[in-house]
């Protein structure tokens, strides 16, 4: 019996950590700033566990019955936590209240589990052995969960089904305990019925997981969701309405097929057309292949390397018929080489030189992306360019995120490079900004590809003129150890979204 109860410790430790990871991941997906979200979720969860452990002192008789009930409650609340949070984000204005309330409730219940189980084991081991065995299995369970979560659960099950699976494990522990401790459970039939009810609810939730996600996302997106994928790095959603296809990463719009050509023509051609000798081009980010499509409009280009972290992103835009139609089959071109790796690490490892680089990362909404907008990153990138080479960076909105935009400019300049900022109007985004960086002064091109839909030599100079409400403001450069850009970005966009 004792080994079976210790196995329960392993399982419930795994469950508790998975619920915590799911809450932190969902908060990062939906609210951004992963450091803040994980810090506050973990802090709330640990404090709640402390409350649960303190409350366990008031549990006197009926330890086995109360342990089973706690397991069922953890399984029910934790199992449905992800589904509740998805729906709450879409339909309530108090998502943070729901988030921390759920984290607190689950934390209190998990905090009750181990003290109750230790008291159940004290008649079978010496106290020192109880503590040693329970904590050993508790930590091993946490290790297993921390490995399973990013490698198996998120990419293969998604957040909703992962939570439900571990809810079923909690319920399974409750059923197992009623069999192991049947002599200490006077109301065993009632507990069996409660366990069965919880299992049935969780199974129904599992079967309805896709529908739950549809309900949650139907209010997040104005158009119909035609594809949704969870990867170890992000949630990819495609929506469609008539001939307008839109890509969202972690609920943030990346492009609309109706006007993305404005963004991508402005991103690529002002810089690349000014480099008539460029033959080798590097693309960092841009896993949709749309920047590559624009690069290949220059017949002189001999080689393009695209580095994107998420293999599912590049696979999707290499195989999906509507998406390959949009990027003109860019990834099938023999001149294009795709590398799925962290761009920062890849720059440190490779020694290849490129004549021009396009940096097309998502906005710096969290620190993992913010590191790709730092002096350290731009310095590493510059080492892969010849003396007359250049790069261009998408740099958020100079109108809606003015400090963020000029922070990118300041950061490029702090790397001892010359920065040439410009902007363009994209209906799906509004005013959007870019920065060309290099060691030599930038001069606007005298020719452009002939098949552009938006950009012309006549309109190009206007992109480099900023009206008073978008002109430069005093900001700090974005360094790796401070990442002030993430704070600027969060403050500015939070102010707009209120």
Segments the model singles out, each with a brief description of its role:
Residues 1-228, 232-323, 328-427, 432-441, ...:
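Alpha-helical transmembrane segments of multi-pass membrane proteins
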Residues 440-498:
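SAM/dcSAM-binding transferase cores
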């Amino acid at each position: 019996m004792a080994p079976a109860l210790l196995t329960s410790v392993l399982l419930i430790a795994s469950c508790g950590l998975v619920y915590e990871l799911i809450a932190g991941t969902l908060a990062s997906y939906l609210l951004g700033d992963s450091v803040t979200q994980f810090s506050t979720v973990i802090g709330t969860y640990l404090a709640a566990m402390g409350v649960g452990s303190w409350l366990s002192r008031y549990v006197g008789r009926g330890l086995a019955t109360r342990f089973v009930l706690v397991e069922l409650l953890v399984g029910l609340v934790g199992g449905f936590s992800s589904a509740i949070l998805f729906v709450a984000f879409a339909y309530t204005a108090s998502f943070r209240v729901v988030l921390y309330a759920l984290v607190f409730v689950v934390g209190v219940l998990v905090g009750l589990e181990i003290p109750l189980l230790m008291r159940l084991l004290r008649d079978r081991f010496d106290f020192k052995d109880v503590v040693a065995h329970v904590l050993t299995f508790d930590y091993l369970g946490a290790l297993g969960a921390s490995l399973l979560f990013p490698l198996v659960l998120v990419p293969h099950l998604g957040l909703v089904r992962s939570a439900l699976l571990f809810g079923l494990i909690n319920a399974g522990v409750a059923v197992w305990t009623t069999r192991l401790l049947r002599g200490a459970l006077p109301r065993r039939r009632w507990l069996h019925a409660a366990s069965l009810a919880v299992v049935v609810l969780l199974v129904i939730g599992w079967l309805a997981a896709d529908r739950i996600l549809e309900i949650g996302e139907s209010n997040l997106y104005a158009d119909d969701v035609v594809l949704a994928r969870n990867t170890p790095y992000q949630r990819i959603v495609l929506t469609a309405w008539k001939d307008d296809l839109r890509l969202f990463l972690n609920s943030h719009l990346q492009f609309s097929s109706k006007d993305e050509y404005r963004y991508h023509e402005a991103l690529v051609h002002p810089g690349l057309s000014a480099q008539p000798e460029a033959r080798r081009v590097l693309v960092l980010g841009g896993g949709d292949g749309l920047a590559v499509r624009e690069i290949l409009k220059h017949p002189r280009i001999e080689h393009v390397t695209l580095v994107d972290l998420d293999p599912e992103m590049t696979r999707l835009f290499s195989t999906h018929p509507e998406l390959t139609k949009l990027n003109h089959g860019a990834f099938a071109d023999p001149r294009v080489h795709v590398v799925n790796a962290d761009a920062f690490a890849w720059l440190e490892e490779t020694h290849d030189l490129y004549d021009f680089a396009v940096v097309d990362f998502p906005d710096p909404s969290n620190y993992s992306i913010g590191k790709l907008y730092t002096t350290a990153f731009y310095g590493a990138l510059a080492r892969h360019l010849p003396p007359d080479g250049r790069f261009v960076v998408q740099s958020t909105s100079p109108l809606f995120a003015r400090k963020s935009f000029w922070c990118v400019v300041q950061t490029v300049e702090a790397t001892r490079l010359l920065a040439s900022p410009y902007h363009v109007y994209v209906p799906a985004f509004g005013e959007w900004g870019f920065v060309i960086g290099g060691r030599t002064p930038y001069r606007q091109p005298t020719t452009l590809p002939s098949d552009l839909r938006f950009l012309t030599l006549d309109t190009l100079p206007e992109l480099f003129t900023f009206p008073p409400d978008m002109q430069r403001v005093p900001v700090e450069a974005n360094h790796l150890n401070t990442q002030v850009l993430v704070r600027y970005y969060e403050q500015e966009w939070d102010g707009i979204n209120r």
